[in-house]
Each structure stands twice: as C-alpha cells, then as structure tokens.
C-alpha cells in the first residue's frame, strides 16, 4: 500500500560515506550504458525548447553525452536525424501521441533514430501504450523511452507494452506547476516516487525533475535511476536556446516549461511557467563540474563507478541538511 511508503525528497536525504578505495577522485568512472550505447554521465538535459536545440544536441553527442531532442519542431525532426547520422552521431528524438505521429514514426523506417522518447505529461495512458507498440512494430531496433509517470503500475504497464525505459516524474520541475494547477504529481516527494517506481522496474528508469544540486544526481542513482533528466541546472548557459534579457545591467535567460503558454503559444491547459535565470557560462563547464562532483560522490560511496552509489546507506533528515547554507 502506498500509505506505508516513506515520503521524502532530495533535500531530506543524506547519503552515508563508505571507506574510499581509489587514490584520486579522477579515477572514478561516471559512464553509464543505455541500450547499446555508453555515455560519459548518467545525466540528460531536459528535452525542452529553452534547454536544447539542434546545435546543443550535436555538441552533446560529439562529446559523448546522452541527449533527447524536443518535439516542438515537428517538421525539423527528419532533417535532424539525417544531420546527426551524416556525422556518425546518434539520433535521439521525441514524439507525442497524436494521430499524425503514427505516420511520422512509419516514415522513419528508411533512417531510424537510435532513441525515441514518447513525451507527454501524463504517460500512464492508453495512447502511450499504443504508441510504444507502434514504434516497436515499425522500428524494432529503436530504444523507446516512455513517460512521464509516477507509479509502479505505470512503470510495469509501459514496460510490458515494450518500453525500453520509463521516465519518472510528474511536475517536480522548477518551471512545472502541475501540482498547483491539478493537485496531482510527485512534486515534493519525487525521490520517494523514484524509489517506489524503481522497485517495480525491470528496465532502466530516467528520473525527471526536482534536481536542484549536483548531489541530487548521486541520490537519484541510489534510489534507482539509471539516468537523470535535468532542466534548470542546464538552463541559462551561453549555448542555451532561451532568449537573453537584460535587467538593470544584469543578463538573464528565459526558461519555461513545456506545458507553459510561452511554449504552447496559447493559454490553454497550462501546467508550466516562465522564469528568468541569471546567465551562466558555457554548458561544457557545467558538465565537467557535474562529472567531477559525481566522481567525488563515487569516492564517498567507497566504489570505482556509479554502481557503488546504488548500495550506500542513507538517513532521512527532514529539511535540515542545508543548516542555513546556500550554494
């Protein structure tokens, strides 16, 4: 029963260190395998318009990182696959579940992408199950990620339909207001929801949303994630597609949710908002810092690679770990 499940979120958890067995943190291996491919880090920038565009996707793929291209330039998806494949890079795109997407998936047979993410807000749906089955029938070699979901039942159903990975997280993101608009979601207990879902999963889980610090990546892996999708920490960089705005001499970048009126172009079924983030430096610098911090996490876990993070002990400290600190 759910009521017996402990409820906590990222800021409520501290991982407990083990004896370090490596000489330097730089020896720690942060690579992860998803399907037939290995990637430098178990993180993926959110497939949102203010986070990723074709140039960012190409940069990430060339540097050995996983990426998922957003689905909001529908006509550009086939040329994008071609562009990536011509350079010997993996193609990873998103689709929705509307009727015309079925024809689109069938049209990919000639040049199938390596990864397709079925990307809708409430992924525990018959429409998603049907789309998984259609993709698997038409493109059997393509790795299918389906989401978003927040329960073990949803994970099992999507896996049984043929999904190769599920994306867990309903509204915990910084620019997501699902919990406010609908009363539903995993906001405030995303890490516990991840743990709950991971116990039921037989295939990889991508934790999506609620990541506010690099330490949250290690916590996600501890509670069952194979990969961690991150929005706000990847927003606001020089390469980020979001519009740059100057306020009182300080530069900011737009960051908005995929279900916001700014993305939709209309105020209808809005479950996202727009915020301004102080402009950051280069995306590559953030990725390097994430890698170094994760290597430190592995050293504290007493291991050599990210699998060691799955077995560490933890304590629930209920909102006290900040102790007045900020980063």
UniProtKB/Swiss-Prot annotation:
Catalytic activity annotation: IMP + NH4(+) + NADP(+) = GMP + NADPH + 2 H(+)
UniProt cross-references to SMART domains, sorted A to Z: IMPDH
InterPro entries with a match to the protein in the record: Aldolase_TIM (IPR013785), GMP_reductase (IPR050139), GuaC_type_2 (IPR005994), IMP_DH/GMP_Rdtase_CS (IPR015875), IMP_DH_GMPRt (IPR001093)
Any one cellular-component term (Gene Ontology): cytosol
Positions with a binding annotation for NADP(+): 205-228
EC number(s) from the headed UniProt entry: 1.7.1.7
Keywords: NADP, Oxidoreductase
Active site positions, chain numbering: 176
Reported function: Catalyzes the irreversible NADPH-dependent deamination of GMP to IMP. It functions in the conversion of nucleobase, nucleoside and nucleotide derivatives of G to A nucleotides, and in maintaining the intracellular balance of A and G nucleotides.
Name of this chain's protein: GMP reductase
UniProt source species: Streptococcus suis (strain 05ZYH33)
